Amino acid sequence: MTSGLPLLDLLACPHDGGTPLRQDADALVCPTCELRFPVSDGLVSFLSAQQLSEQDHKERSHRDSEASWYDAMFEGYTNAVEVPAGVRRIGRPTGPVLDAGCGTGRITEALLALGQPVVAVDYSEGTLRLMQRRVKEAGVPVLAVQSDLRALPLRPGVMAAVTCIEVYAQLRADDRRKLLVEFDRVMAPGAVLSMSAYNYNLVFKAWKLRGNEGAREGFHMLGGDYYYIRMTKDEYRRELEAVFDVEELTGIRNIPARSLAQGLRRLGLPTAGDRLLDYMVRTGHRADFWLENVPLVADNVGFFWQAKARKRDD
């Protein structure tokens, strides 16, 4: 990993309107409000100076403690589909890219392959440290930033593109709006946002009809503290269009490869299940990409919505 310290010029104080920061030994300092933001092993932390709710602190604590499990959860078919779907929609940016809610760096790694520097932001130090290890050989600058996404410590108009994968659906309505406004603030004119959300698809609508209250919104079972909501296409589009011009909105992860493999294992065919999943990871996921262009399928069975939205001209 090439040091992200040259990217420090992109940062600004999130508390006083975006004052540029100055370096002072092991911290960045705001010359206006005099707040100090520690820098440790290439990671800049703004979290201690940000006002997080009790719920936010619980979620961050769980993310820290489950960072390794979280990293392993996205291996295989999930990454084979989600990473290319999220990254290819920003095209070939000609400037720094923001990976918002970077987690352990699965998207960050793919963004660095585009050859542009990346600012990787998350509120979990545990996942940020795993991200740093993942991309240490990238050869392209990446800056790890611990921060609340709703108050990004970035100067206005500095990001050529933004990715935000598996974050939006974890926020309630007011916070989703704050997130979009912050993205708009830090994006350069014409910059593209690639962002996913949970799809309230036919499967979950059927679950809802059968009395499953968690089909629409609720809290993830693991940890018990992660809110989520599944959205219809119209709902997601309306929220995005309040701030951005939406250029594409389609369902992704249209083939339930892991569920099919698990079904074969339950039928006493573990080898067949393993072979199916291996095939889908190596080659079969390309069919998932093709189905993104078939609205009748993608809109109704895709697990996620994947959006491409562009910053409006001022």
PLM ranges: what are they?
Residues 104-151:
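Class I SAM-dependent methyltransferase SAM/SAH-binding core
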Residues 252-314:
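A C-terminal cap/extension of S-adenosyl-L-methionine-dependent methyltransferases
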